[in-house]
Regions:
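Bacterial/eukaryotic Sec-type N-terminal signal peptides
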Residues: 1-4, 437, 473
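Short hydrophobic helices that act as membrane-entry/anchoring signals
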Residues: 444, 451-473
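Alpha-helical coiled-coil heptad-register detector
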Residues: 406-409, 413, 420, 427, ...
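Short intrinsically disordered, low-complexity segments
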Residues: 432-434, 462
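Active-site anion-handling motifs in enzyme catalytic cores
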Residues: 2-424
Length: 473
C-alpha cells in the first residue's frame, strides 16, 4: 500500500495518535499536554483519536481523560499513525519520579519506559515519532543508554525540546541541526482557554467560594515564607486582595498546610479540579507565586505576573529568564509596602508570549504535516542497530570486567593499606589485653593487702601519721 492509499484510508477514520508521559499522576503541568495536543491537532487534522499512554491506566469517569497502560503498547503500536513524546521533564534516568511511582510490570524499565521505549517501538514499526518539546533538568545521561538514545533520535521524524540545556545534552546523539528548541507547548494555554467550558466552571468555583477579584494565586508548597511574611506585614496596604491556595502537584506533596495559617483572606478548594479549570483560575488572578514551571507558563500566557522561588539560571527554568514579568520573591525583611502592588496586575500577554505562540503555531502545522505523511521505512536503522548490538553488549561487559586501570591500582593500594591497618589493630588489641591483665593482677594484690592482718594492725599508725602531717602543715 502506498502513502496515497494509506492516507485515503485514514480519511475514513480518525487519526490515531499516541502521546507518552506521566499522565497518570496528579500533577498539573503533565496533565495539560494531551489536552493541548488534541486541541491543536484537531484544528489541523479533523477527527483525532489521541491516546495518552502512561504506566497506569485511568478511566475518564474519575480522571480528566482516559489513559492507556504502557503494558498495552506492544499490542497497540502498529495501529498508531504517530507518536508524541512528552512534553514535560521526562528525559531522565533517575528512579525517583514521585513517591511510590513505578511501572505496572517488571519488564517495563523505569523511568525510560514512558519516553525512550515508546520512541524505540515507534522506530520498530515505522511510526513517525515527534518529540513534543520535552526536557531535562540538570540530570545526567548514563553510558549504557547512549546507543539506544542515538537510535531513538536518529529514527525520529521531528525533535523539539523546550530549552537550550536539553538541546545541549541531546546533540551528541544525533545530527545537531535536527534538535530544535521550542517553547513548552503549554504556552498556548491562554489561547486554548478562550471559549473553553472550563472558564465557566472556574467562575462557578469562585462564586461558591466567595472569591472576588483581585486575587493572588499561591502554590500550596514549601519555601514561600518570604512572600507570606511580606503579605502578613503589609496586609493593611492590600485590604482588597484575596489569596487562593492551589495544589499544583498533589503527587509531589503540595498541601495547604505548608502556607502560614495566620495569613488572612485565604481561600482553598475542597477538591482538586480538572487541569483546564486550574488554568482558568490561574489566568483570572492578578499574580501567582510558587516554584511550579507550568504555574509560571500558564500565568505568562494569560498576562499574569509571576513571583518564582526557583533559580532561573538552572535547567528548565532558564526558559523563563527572558520574561520581564517573572520576579523573585520579596527580599528578606522587605520594608517597602509598595513592592508587591507595583509588580502585580494582569495585562495583555507580552510580545515574548506572542512570539512563543507563533512558534507553536508553526510547530503544530509541521506536526500535522508529519502525521499526514504517514509511516516511514525504518528497517535500515533498526537492522543496523541489531547488527551492532552484540558488539555493544560485549564492550559493556569488558568495561565492567576490566575497569579503569588507575582505579584498579587505587583499589590494590587501598587493600594493602587495609591489611596494614588490620595488622596494627591486632597488635593494639594484644597490647590492650596485656594491660588489662596486669591491671586485674594489681587490683587483686591491692584487695589482698587491704584484707591482710598487717594492714589492719598498722591502721592506727597511718591515722596518727596523717594527723602529724596536718599539724606540720
Amino acid at each position: 500500500m502506498n502513502a496515497t492509499d494509506s492516507n485515503a484510508m485514514k480519511n475514513q477514520r480518525s487519526w490515531r495518535i499516541g502521546i507518552f508521559g506521566t499522565f497518570d499522576v496528579e500533577n498539573y503541568g503533565d496533565l495539560l499536554f494531551p489536552i493541548i495536543a488534541e486541541l491543536e491537532l484537531s484544528r489541523r487534522l479533523g477527527s483525532v483519536e489521541l491516546t495518552p499512554f502512561s504506566y497506569h491506566a485511568k478511566s475518564s469517569d474519575d480522571w480528566p481523560y482516559g489513559v492507556e497502560s504502557l503494558a498495552e503498547l506492544p499490542r497497540m503500536a502498529s495501529d498508531l499513525d504517530a507518536i508524541l513524546i512528552g512534553g514535560g521533564f521526562i528525559v531522565r534516568f533517575d528512579k525517583f519520579i514521585a513517591p511510590g511511582y513505578g511501572p505496572p510490570a517488571t519488564w517495563i524499565h523505569h523511568p525510560t519506559g514512558y519516553w525512550l521505549a515508546p520512541a524505540l517501538v515507534g522506530a520498530q514499526h515505522g511510526v513517525p515519532v515527534i518529540w513534543n518539546a520535552p526536557g531535562m533538568h540538570c540530570n545526567e545521561i548514563p553510558d549504557w543508554s547512549h546507543p539506544l538514545l542515538s537510535l531513538a533520535l536518529d529514527s525520529s521524524a521531528h525533535i523539539a525540546v523546550r530549552d537550550e540545556p536539553s538541546k545541549t545534552a541531546l546533540r551528541p546523539f544525533v545530527e545537531p541541526q535536527r534538535v530544535h528548541v521550542m517553547p513548552d507547548t503549554a504556552f498556548s494555554i491562554g489561547r486554548c482557554l478562550k471559549s473553553h467550558a472550563a472558564t465557566d466552571e472556574a467562575a462557578a468555583i469562585r462564586d461558591a467560594l466567595g472569591l472576588k477579584a483581585p486575587y493572588l494565586v499561591i502554590q500550596a508548597t514549601q519555601n514561600l515564607e518570604r512572600l507570606t511574611d511580606y503579605l502578613k506585614k503589609f496586609r493593611t496596604e492590600l485590604p482588597n486582595l484575596s489569596v487562593l491556595l492551589l495544589r499544583l502537584g498533589p503527587v509531589l506533596c503540595d498541601h495547604e498546610s505548608f502556607i502560614d495559617s495566620e495569613l488572612q483572606g485565604t481561600f482553598c478548594l475542597s477538591a482538586w479540579p480538572s487541569p483546564m479549570v486550574l488554568a482558568s483560575l490561574i489566568g483570572g488572578s492578578e499574580a501567582v507565586a510558587g516554584h511550579s514551571y507550568h504555574l509560571a507558563i500558564t500565568a505568562l500566557s494569560c498576562g499574569v505576573p509571576v513571583f518564582s522561588s526557583s533559580d532561573l539560571s538552572q535547567g528548565k527554568f532558564t526558559a523563563l529568564a527572558k520574561f520581564d514579568t517573572v520576579h523573585p520573591l520579596p527580599p528578606e525583611g522587605c520594608d517597602d509596602p509598595q513592592w508587591l502592588s507595583q509588580r502585580m496586575g494582569r495585562k495583555e500577554p507580552s510580545h515574548v508570549v506572542v512570539e512563543a505562540n507563533d512558534m507553536l503555531e508553526n510547530y503544530w502545522n509541521h506536526v500535522a504535516t508529519v502525521v499526514r505523511a504517514g509511516k516511514t521505512d525504518s528497517t535500515t536503522a533498526t537492522s543496523a542497530f541489531l547488527m551492532s548490538l552484540p558488539g555493544i553488549l560485549e564492550h559493556g561487559q569488558r568495561q565492567a570486567g576490566a575497569g579503569d586501570p588507575e582505579s584498579a591500582d587505587h583499589l590494590r593500594d587501598l587493600k594493602a593499606r587495609l591489611i596494614g591497618c588490620e595488622d596494627s589493630l591486632g597488635e593494639a588489641k594484644a597490647q590492650l589485653s596485656e594491660v588489662t591483665r596486669r591491671s586485674l593482677d594489681l587490683e587483686t594484690q591491692l584487695l589482698e593487702l587491704h584484707q591482710s592482718m598487717s594492714w589492719k594492725t598498722t591502721a592506727p599508725l597511718r591515722r596518727a601519721w596523717r594527723w602529724l602531717q596536718g599539724l606540720s602543715a
